[in-house]
Amino acid sequence: MLDEYKLTHLKQLEAESIHIIREVAAEFDNPVMLYSIGKDSAVMLHLAMKAFAPGKPPFPLMHVDTTWKFKEMIEFRDKYVKELGLELIVHSNQEGIDMGISPFVHGSAKHTDIMKTQALKQALDKHGFDAAFGGARRDEEKSRAKERVYSFRDKKHRWDPKNQRPELWNIYNSRVDKGESIRVFPLSNWTELDIWQYIHLESIPLVPLYFAAKRPVVERDGTLIMVDDDRMPIEPGEKVEEKMVRFRTLGCYPLTGAVESEATTLPEIIQEMLLTTTSERQGRVIDHDSSGSMEKKKQEGYF
């Protein structure tokens, strides 16, 4: 009889993720779900809603706002969270804002450290969260490929890849001392294609930036950067052009490259994913600061 009941691979992934989310809610005193407004966050939030239906997730959402996100992302965030009736904490590094930190002036490494990493650590300390959900997947990037589902962080929020706990089957060690925490990745075993197929299957709402449209872009160092507001300086020799583009990954607009595409629907995006040979994070400028830059950022407290 058991052999007759088989889950599709998407339903298996869904069940695993829901188990992890419920496990965290049961084991930790003060968890939070990081909501970056991207496709992975959208899937993770959808799974959290399913995990506790018909009730609401017993933890708040939190968005670390660098003040450089795409306008459409912020509009979507506020509208969608309101529709779901969830608590949303928005945190920005006020010190960085007062310093006028800008990815254009100070570069991606300094901007990311101050406005993302330090801001995240500030927020986690301020609210005393002992577990934080994130939407990272192992197929995204090499340092994430070796990260546990329960990723242990010390009292300074640092990640030591050599000091992680074994995870046997679906057994997770949630023990932490005061001040320590766990970053939890329920989507660890999903791929980018899985994410898109699940979004299509479940009709999950997304920021329109993921779909191809005519957008004003500038080509800079081989990357198509969308001109999202008047803070973007146009350098000599550069020209703003309207191109049919979409985004495979979303972050701060000056540090996120668009890809030329004609995919305006979910089936077209899935077809594109089946044919692509490049990583979705190829368009993230912060990943190219230096060799192993993502691992270094994570060791400093980055998600």
From Swiss-Prot:
Which leading EC class covers this enzyme?
A: transferase
> Can you state which reaction this protein catalyses?
sulfate + ATP + H(+) = adenosine 5'-phosphosulfate + diphosphate
A biological process term (GO) from this entry: hydrogen sulfide biosynthetic process
Q: Which PANTHER family match?
A: SULFATE ADENYLYLTRANSFERASE SUBUNIT 2 (PTHR43196:SF1)
A Pfam short name: PAPS_reduct
Q: What does this protein do?
A: With CysN forms the ATP sulfurylase (ATPS) that catalyzes the adenylation of sulfate producing adenosine 5'-phosphosulfate (APS) and diphosphate, the first enzymatic step in sulfur assimilation pathway. APS synthesis involves the formation of a high-energy phosphoric-sulfuric acid anhydride bond driven by GTP hydrolysis by CysN coupled to ATP hydrolysis by CysD.
Task: Name the UniProt key words of this record, in alphabetical order.
Answer: ATP-binding, Nucleotide-binding, Nucleotidyltransferase, Transferase
Subunit composition and interactions: Heterodimer composed of CysD, the smaller subunit, and CysN.
Question: Single GO molecular-function term?
Answer: sulfate adenylyltransferase (ATP) activity
Disulfides per UniProt: none
Q: What is the lineage of its organism?
A: Bacteria, Pseudomonadati, Pseudomonadota, Gammaproteobacteria, Cellvibrionales
Q: Where is this region: Disordered?
A: 281-303
Q: Name the chain's protein.
A: Sulfate adenylyltransferase subunit 2
What protein family does this chain belong to?
Belongs to the PAPS reductase family. CysD subfamily.
Nucleotide-binding listed as a keyword: yes
Q: What is its EC number?
A: 2.7.7.4
By its UniProt entry, which NCBIfam families does this protein fall under?
Answer: CysD (TIGR02039), PRK05253.1 (NF003587), PRK12563.1 (NF009214)
Task: Give, as in the UniProt entry, the pathway in which the protein acts.
Answer: Sulfur metabolism; hydrogen sulfide biosynthesis; sulfite from sulfate: step 1/3
- Organism (species): Saccharophagus degradans (strain 2-40 / ATCC 43961 / DSM 17024)
Q: Does the keyword ATP-binding apply?
A: yes
